Amino acid sequence: MRVAVISDTHLDEPTPWFRRVFDEHLAKADAIIHCGDISGDGMVRFLEASHPNVHMVCGNMCTGSARRHLAPRIAVTFEGFRVGASHGTCSQGSSAEYVLREFGPDFEVICYGHTHVFDWRKIDGRWVLNPGALQEGEGSFAYLDLVPGEEPKAVQVRV
């Protein structure tokens, strides 16, 4: 299973650039996880209408109904892998270590955003993934490949 993990789009509505990235890359994924800072209602509506398997969390910069209706963290299971996602906003210390504490030991992969910096590493037996910021000019996201019986794999995609 291939999951497109995105974060920190900071858009109220999808721009032509974002629509192109969506059509060329994200739409082909089996699922999409958005790790927060979507930012507005138009982006939430676009993602929900454009993909049948999208999961989103609220970030510190979300506005409107996105702030009111998106959870601060989610847990999903893909191909037997427990995957958690949150924005990763923390007042001190590392966002990766914060989300590890936030979710506890029962997750194989934890996705987060906030820092705008790609991160893929194993800490204490669990994988953490930050896809970077999917913004025009500094765009990146990650494909997370989950195959039963294999270690999770992630690759950064610059757009």
Predicted regions and their residues:
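Active-site environment of divalent metal-dependent phosphoester hydrolases
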Residues: 11-14, 39-42, 61-67, 90-95, ...
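P-loop/Walker A phosphate-binding loop and immediately adjacent motor/lid segment at beta-alpha junctions
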Residues: 3-4, 48-64, 77, 125-127, ...
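Pre-active-site segment of Zn-dependent metallo-hydrolases
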Residues: 14-24, 85-86, 90-104
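Binuclear metal-dependent phosphoesterase catalytic core
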Residues: 6, 78-79, 105-107, 122, ...
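N-terminal active-site segment of His-dependent metallophosphoesterases
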Residues: 1-49, 53, 62-71
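Active-site neighborhood of phospho(di)ester-bond hydrolases with catalytic His/Asp-centered motifs
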Residues: 5-7, 31-37, 55-60, 84-87, ...
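Residue-level detector of beta-strand structural context in well-folded domains
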Residues: 73-74, 118-119, 142
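Helix-adjacent hinge/juxtasegments
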Residues: 53-92
